[in-house]
A protein has these predicted regions:
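Conserved SAM-binding strand-loop segment of SAM-dependent methyltransferases
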Residues: 55-62
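Short, conserved SAM-binding/catalytic segment
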Residues: 49-55, 113-117
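Short, Asp-centered acidic motifs that coordinate Mg2+ and/or phosphate
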Residues: 37, 57, 72-73, 153
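Predominantly a Rossmann-like dinucleotide-binding segment in NAD(P)-dependent oxidoreductases
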Residues: 130-209, 227, 333
Length: 333
């Protein structure tokens, strides 16, 4: 990408729902990027989405999109088991890659992808959009600034209901399951807030008897003398919440991951001294933003400035290592 005001030209691999409904519109609203192409193995589907979203080019193969010389970067929302293959192929084509989470199926595969992209000289980032939302930047600022004292615990719940056997999230060989799809979020949050990797991981999981994917996974990560705990499920009432607890206060993040784009978000900060006899709770409100747009602009700026992405590949590798550890601790294959 020419280090100028020229927008980053994006190509999108597949007509996946997350791209159609969320990420593509967000990039189209961004300051530093534009979507110029979309590809699908179903050419009619690619053209239909392109027409619907106003995308100039539609390709009937991923290879054709990667061969186009007017594309700077690729957004990869393919099923998890295809992340590694097509991220590498995009790198070989000289395209920067924003890859949906989790980056790969395991740490070993992630290490190979990262090395491949480094050798190709392209910018690679795992798409954890929540990290760009002001509510999380503020939460991190409060924790690092000592507003709640010493960080002692992070607790998270994230769930939705999906029992469609044909859905990729319920297919084991595609990298489906609650841990891979949404467990990666609380793991990422805990590592980021503690600024460290866990010393120990314990976990339990319940698996669907037919598909074999985990449908309820709970884990505890030890960070020195502090703990992070989470439960994720794909077969319970949709809900998400994160509690960040310190020695002299706590923070509750109301909608931590799927922050809405149609209303403000809030965090609840309770800090009443040590010990807090009757602490007051302050509600901090954040203006309406699209965290996917913020992510796209940050990625484009990193490429323009010739620097590593805001979430470097090393972070994706470390997160994948913890996912592996949770799987192992829960007794999964």
């Amino acid at each position: 990408m020419n280090p100028s005001a020229t927008p980053l030209r994006w190509g999108v691999l597949s007509t996946a729902k997350i791209g159609r409904t969320t990420v593509i519109p967000a990039i189209q609203r961004s300051e530093h990027g534009t979507v110029v192409a979309i590809a699908s193995r179903d050419g009619e589907a690619a053209h239909a989405v392109a027409d619907d979203l106003g995308i100039p080019q539609a390709f009937s193969s991923y290879e054709a999109l990667l061969a186009a010389d007017d594309i700077d970067a690729v957004y990869n929302p393919l099923p998890n088991h295809l992340h590694a293959e097509w991220t590498k192929k995009a790198a070989d084509a000289g395209k920067h890659v924003l890859c949906e989470k989790p980056l790969t199926l395991d740490r070993t595969e992630a290490a190979g992808v990262i090395a491949h992209c480094e050798a190709a000289g392209i910018v690679l980032q795992e798409a954890f959009m929540y990290r760009f939302h002001p509510q999380w930047l503020r939460t991190k600022q409060l924790v690092d600034g000592g507003r709640i004292g010493e960080l002692r615990a992070v607790q998270a719940w994230f769930s939705y209901f999906n029992d469609d056997a044909a859905n990729i999230r319920n297919v084991a060989e595609y990298g489906g399951g609650a841990l891979m799809d949404i467990g990666c979020y609380p793991i990422s949050v805990a590592r980021w807030l503690f600024g460290a990797e866990p010393d120990d991981v314990q976990a339990i999981a319940h698996h669907d008897p037919v598909s074999g994917v985990d449908i309820l996974t709970s884990a505890m990560m030890r960070f020195g003398t502090a703990h992070a705990t989470f439960s994720v499920s794909t077969r319970t009432e949709p809900y998400q919440r994160v509690h960040v607890i310190g020695t002299t206060g706590r923070i509750e993040v109301e909608i931590p991951f799927n922050a809405p784009t149609d209303r403000p978000t809030h965090i609840f900060v309770t800090a009443g001294g040590s010990p807090p006899a009757d602490p007051a709770t302050e509600i901090e409100e954040f203006a309406i933003v699209d965290q996917y747009t913020l992510q796209a602009d940050a990625f484009a700026m990193a490429i323009r400035d010739g620097r590593t992405a805001a979430l470097p590949p090393s972070d994706a590798l470390a997160n994948m290592a913890v996912i592996d550890a949770v799987r192992t601790a829960a007794g999964a294959a």
